[in-house]
Structure formats: C-alpha cells, structure tokens
Amino acid sequence: MSGKCRKIMYALVVTVFAAFLWMICCENDRKVSDKAIGETTVQSMRSGEKTVSLEQSDIPKIEIKDLTDAFTVILQYAPKDMLAGCTVDESFLMWFYAQYGRDAVIHIAFDVLDGGNDPDVWYEETGNSIHVLWLLYCRDSGFGQHELENVYWMQTAAASEMVFGFAGDINFAENWYTTEYMKEQPDGLRDCFSEDLLAQMQGVDVMIMNNEFTYANKKGATSVYGKAYTFRADPQKAELLEIFGTDTVTLANNHVYDYGKRGLLSTLDVLDQEGIPYSGAGRNLKDASKIIYYVMNGRKVAFVSAT
C-alpha cells in the first residue's frame, strides 16, 4: 500500500473514531434549543469567512452540564482572538477531549462564557498554546499536513524558558584571512574560539548564524561582475557549522549571490545535505519567503530572515 493511501486510510479512521466518540458523549446529553441560542449570527471558523465579534452580553445564558453544552459554547461563541486563527471545529474538539479530558473542554467553555478572549487559556489548561495544539492535531489526524512544513520540535534545557543564540556574519571563504588563520591552528576552528564561548553557543536551545558567503566548488564557479569582495567556501566546510551548534542559518545577505545563480543553488544543496534549515533565500520566491517554526515548551515561535 502506498504512503499516500495509508495517510488517507488513517485520516478516515480518525474521522470515524471522532464521530463514534461524539455519539457516545452526546447520548442522553441535553440539547440547547434554537431559542436558547438566540438569533445572534455566528459564522463558523471553518467557513473561512469573517467571524462576528461577540460581546459577553450577546452570549445567551447557557448552563454547562455536559460536553454537548461545552462544545456548543466553544463552537458558537468562542471569540476569534481566543482561537488565534486556528480552525477549531467538532473534529478538533473531539481530539482535544481525547487528549486532555472532559474537564479541560468544560474549563475552556466556562472561560468563553466568562467573556474571556485570551488564547493563553489553552496553554494554561494543557501546557500547549492553541497553535501547538493545532499542529499536534494535524500530526495525529493526518489532516492539514502542509501545516507541519518547516516545523522543528526542539528540546529545551529548561522547561521555564526558551534560549535563542544569534551570531553575526560567519565566513569560511577560501583565501580570506580568517580562513587562512583557521587553517594554521592545530585544532582548526576550535582553536579560534574559547571553550567557554563554544560551550555557550552549543548550550542554547536554538543557535542561528548568518551565512555570509556561498558554498561552491572552485571549478565552474564564477563570481558576479563588478563586486569588490566575493566569498566562496569549499562545500566541505559546511561541516564546521556543527562546532557552533548551529540549528539554522540566515541567507538574506549581500554575499549569498556572490557567485550567481549557480553559487546560490550550490549553497542550498550543501545546506540541505547537512540538514541545516535556512531562511532568506531559496530556489524560488516561495522557498525564499518561507517561515521556520520552532516548537518548544508548548509554544510555537516563528523565524524569518529578510534584507
């Protein structure tokens, strides 16, 4: 069976299972009448249309006794700020219930009735933001797989914080004075930095470097005309990024195109081979504009690079 068929079958199984759980939860539950809901117009987040903003006074008095009530309140009356652009529908709530239990659903519903609109209520209840919950739902259900592109799940040194490290320009270019100095050292790049500094760079949760040169072989690589300084590094030097504990490199700089299109594509190929995510340049505009996401400690952090 192909991978695509397995994903489709898995998605169908999840859908059927969610529907079965919904039937069990709804059995003997009190239904909220149309009169109780009132004539307030509420547009579903799934429709893709603009969501009507509701004041607390617009929400009818609903006594939450069971999951049916809780689902109704969240689906009909949760403000768009609380949902933070995520598609919270019946399927998502059934998954949420299966993962975090009845009380978590009801607590969210009570927050809606209390006029809450802070999306952090999801994090406070589960330890995951609504954005991370949505990614977990997509991962588990097989739906919205495009949402998982360029997402990196990172372990942090401490549960209470996320530590990012940012370095300025790095340059491994051939015949450049810093590269020549590095070659003269017994332990190469490691001798160019103190052990304490390298340990600090390797110890952060995410280390980001600005790749201020191109990776390309000398044969066939031609620098662009008219530039006073052009930087080209042997592709094998990409292995040095590991010494810094590099997690991502930025390419939105004035030297990534020093060797034209061929040099740029070679740089992207080398980084892909090393498994180093990059931002700020790409094989096309979409690739160059991509956002890199890190998920740490229940939070989703977006990173972009531009110049």
Tell where the protein language model's regions lie, with residue ranges.
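N-terminal Sec-pathway targeting helices
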Residues: 1-14
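Bacterial N-terminal signal peptides
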Residues: 14-20
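Sec-dependent signal peptide cleavage junction
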Residues: 22-36
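Zinc-dependent metallopeptidase catalytic helix centered on the HExxH motif
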Residues: 43, 49-50, 54-80
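Stable alpha-helical elements in mature extracytoplasmic
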Residues: 63, 67-70, 88-92, 104-108, ...
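Pan-zinc metallopeptidase signature
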Residues: 67, 82-151
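Sec-exported extracytoplasmic/periplasmic mature domains
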Residues: 76-79, 94-102, 110-114, 138, ...
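Acidic, metal/ion-coordinating pockets
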Residues: 150-307
